[in-house]
Amino acid sequence: VAVVGAGGTGAYYGGALARAGADVTMIARGPHLEAINKNGLQLNSVLLGDFLVECAATDDMSSVGRVDLVIFAVKSWGTDAAIEAMASGDMVGDGTMIISTQNGIDSEPLLSKAFGSEHVLGSTATVSAMITEPGVVNQAGGPGSLVIGEMSGGSSGRVTSLVERCVAAGIAAEADENINMALWMKFTFICALSGMTALTRKPIGDIFAQETTTEMYLQVLSEVAAVARAEGVPISQEMVDATLKTTQGREPFIIGSMGHDLIAGNPIEIGLLNARVVEMGKQHNIPTPANFAIEAALRPHEDGA
């Protein structure tokens, strides 16, 4: 297994598999890479417990060789460079499966274009995990789920077996025969969560404590769903309302990944999330004022502080 981008999310899933005995190589860089090589990866998780796992780590993808599974977990601004390095590193062989934990709806098409659609499974990862210091990842929120499916729909032996391996490692994994719907539902959820927590620089508890921000949160969700329907994905208003209700029941301290990146002064994924909704809305003549407001406020921060 190769984890391309061993930040919070990649390290959580890769660390769980490594603890269960999988041969995992973490692709990381800088002090985080040095710390993993020196001390191992320390994962502190409310779901999996706290543990230290020894695993290979490198910043050179050409040294990894062929793998059975790639977990593609880089931030969106690193996608093109990571795909290029993967391609030159000969990591993808005949039977290699690639799953992406990235936010957004664009990584599966990009990976399919680079490596062939037969290698790419659809997947959605829902976990709140972050690097708190080099070599240390904390997972404090989110269900830690991983939903996997064939992009063409239906079931397959490779999806079933991958899900079984993940479940055996303690990951809340499941197969989905309509993964495209799952990808769009996650996109809808994350545009609101990340967009609104970045816009307000506040966790969801503070957002839902105010009528105005709750109303805007729902508007973001509804706009994404309208765009999804225009793209042929039937997300109903009932599903939107259920998503809002579920989010309101989550831990009040949760901040979306874009909110964390903004607060830390890192580049943010606005182009992949709310701005993408605005772009698709224009294509379909669907107004997206709430997503546009988020894009307008956050574009100046796109490249970090």
List each model region and its residues.
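N-terminal glycine-rich dinucleotide-binding loop that anchors FAD/FMN and/or NAD(P) in oxidoreductases
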Residues: 41-57, 190
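Rossmann-like NAD(P)(H) cofactor-binding subdomain of soluble oxidoreductases
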Residues: 50-136
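Internal alpha-helical scaffold of NAD(P)-dependent oxidoreductase catalytic cores
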Residues: 89-93, 114-119, 134-186, 191, ...
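NAD(P)-dependent Rossmann-like dehydrogenase/reductase catalytic/cofactor-binding core
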Residues: 218-305
